[in-house]
């Protein structure tokens, strides 16, 4: 078996390196460093330093992208972050200082393969590779345009903040949160379970702060060595998850869900703060994360993303969906107007076609009964003669025989309907008279 990555770093050199890095007293070894660029691969035999210069221009297409540096070799090498390029001395917040200290202290001293994810739009990142022997090692940098982890964290943060009030009142989510807290932060879970046995509140808050710091450190250690632990000690990891998860569920079930409004409110605020952490960790550009976190607490800001998504979805649906043809019946007036318009348009098209030089006029004239009338139509005369117009008015106009026949038929049908209804009413009355019982007023006297 070849050399593998050592899971734990030796505390002596790492602690010394941490102290020097925090003090900023270690100068850069050597002269210029090799610059890392996206998509490039560098192969070296001897000790060398490498730097990644951050791009100061922000691009929104990189909001969920990550830059990953991979260092691999057939033999072990030492990975040393360049102290003056580290962020510890110039940390702006306590969280950045603690993260930098943990990163320098926890980084394994020797390994055969190392993966680094560089935070973009921050400080320039430099490190040094020290091989124990002259063996070829490779340093490559790649960019993943859409990191699924970042997108999942961002979506989870938005969902958790938006439904924090509803989730804090859910019994199932309470048990699920207890299991997750017990697995990831066992010390915090145990302290919360034993809260009733701690008399002073100040002591409880001091212990809670220490447990949270220890839990965050253990979470970071597990994250950095998760691949190695899963490949080498999978059974122990699964056993820990099952045992601690079951114990956490039993403790939450014994305690019962939250009932007081104060506890539910505190749980809601905790979920919202966790959502802010997810949003910040799920966005690669800090300025964008700050803007989203600033907009989310406002009541009006809660309605903007759903409204914008609904508006964009409606526009896309109208754009891609084929328009349905609406069919309706024409009124009598619309039918007459449309008929006159289409007739005039068709006659003009016929005149234009007959005036075309390609039209075989002699062949058409030979088949017509009145060529003189056809020539007049082509030159602009009406297609109907005055005699034909008069005959049409007499046949279908006001006072025509056709209209009289229509009116007579309508009147006859209405009279027949009235007669039929009268006959039915008479029959009903006769039936009522037949079925009506006959009374004998003198029946008593006859008896």
Swiss-Prot record:
Gene Ontology cellular component list: nuclear envelope; nuclear inner membrane
Encoding gene (name): NEMP2
Signal peptide (UniProt feature, chain positions): 1-28
Membrane topology qualifier: Multi-pass membrane protein
Xref: InterPro entries: NEMP_fam (IPR019358)
Keyword Thylakoid part of the UniProt annotation: no
Region called Disordered, residue ranges: 410-438
Superkingdom field: Eukaryota
Keywords tagged on the record: Membrane, Nucleus, Signal, Transmembrane, Transmembrane helix
Keyword Calcium attached: no
Localisation: Nucleus inner membrane
Source organism of the structure: Gallus gallus
Protein name (Swiss-Prot/TrEMBL): Nuclear envelope integral membrane protein 2
Family to which the UniProt record says this protein belongs: Belongs to the NEMP family.
TM spans (from-to): 144-164, 173-193, 202-222, 235-255, 275-295
């Amino acid at each position: 078996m070849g050399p593998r990555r050592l899971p734990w770093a030796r505390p002596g050199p790492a602690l010394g390196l941490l102290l020097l890095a925090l003090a900023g007293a270690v100068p850069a070894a050597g002269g210029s460093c090799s610059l890392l660029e996206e998509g490039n691969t560098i192969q070296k035999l001897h000790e060398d330093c490498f730097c990644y210069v951050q791009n100061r221009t922000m691009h929104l297409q990189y909001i969920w992208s990550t830059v990953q540096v991979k260092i691999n070799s057939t033999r072990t090498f030492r990975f040393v972050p360049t102290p003056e390029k580290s962020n510890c001395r110039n940390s702006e917040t306590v969280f950045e200082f603690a993260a930098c200290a943990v990163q320098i202290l926890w980084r394994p001293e020797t390994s055969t393969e190392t993966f680094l994810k560089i935070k973009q739009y921050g400080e320039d990142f430099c490190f040094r590779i020290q091989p124990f022997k002259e063996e070829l090692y490779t340093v490559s940098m790649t960019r993943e345009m859409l990191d699924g982890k970042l997108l999942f964290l961002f979506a989870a943060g938005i969902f958790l903040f938006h439904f924090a009030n509803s989730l804090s009142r859910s019994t199932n989510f309470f048990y699920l949160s207890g299991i997750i807290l017990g697995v990831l932060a066992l010390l915090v879970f145990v302290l919360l379970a034993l809260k009733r046995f701690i008399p002073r509140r100040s002591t409880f808050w001091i212990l809670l702060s220490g447990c949270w710091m220890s839990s965050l450190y253990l979470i970071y250690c597990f994250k950095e060595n998760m691949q190695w632990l899963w490949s080498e000690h999978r059974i122990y990891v699964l056993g820990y998850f099952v045992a601690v998860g079951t114990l956490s569920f039993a403790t939450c079930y014994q305690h019962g869900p939250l009932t007081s409004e104060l506890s539910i409110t505190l749980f809601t605020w905790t979920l919202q703060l966790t959502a802010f952490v997810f949003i910040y960790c799920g966005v690669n550009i800090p300025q964008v994360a700050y803007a989203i976190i600033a907009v989310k607490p406002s009541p009006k800001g809660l309605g903007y993303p759903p409204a914008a998504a609904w508006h964009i979805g409606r526009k896309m649906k109208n754009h891609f969906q084929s328009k349905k043809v609406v069919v309706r019946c024409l009124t009598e007036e619309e039918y007459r107007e449309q008929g006159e318009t289409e007739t005039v348009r068709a006659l003009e098209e016929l005149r234009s076609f007959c005036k075309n030089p390609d039209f075989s006029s002699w062949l058409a004239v030979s088949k017509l009964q009145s060529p003189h009338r056809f020539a007049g139509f082509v030159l602009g005369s009406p297609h109907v003669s005055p005699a034909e117009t008069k005959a049409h008015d007499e046949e279908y106009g006001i006072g025509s025989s056709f209209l009289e026949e229509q009116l007579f038929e309508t009147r006859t049908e209405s009279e027949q309907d009235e007669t039929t209804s009268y006959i039915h009413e008479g029959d009903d009355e006769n039936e009522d008279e037949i079925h009506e019982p006959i009374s004998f007023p003198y029946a008593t006297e006859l008896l």
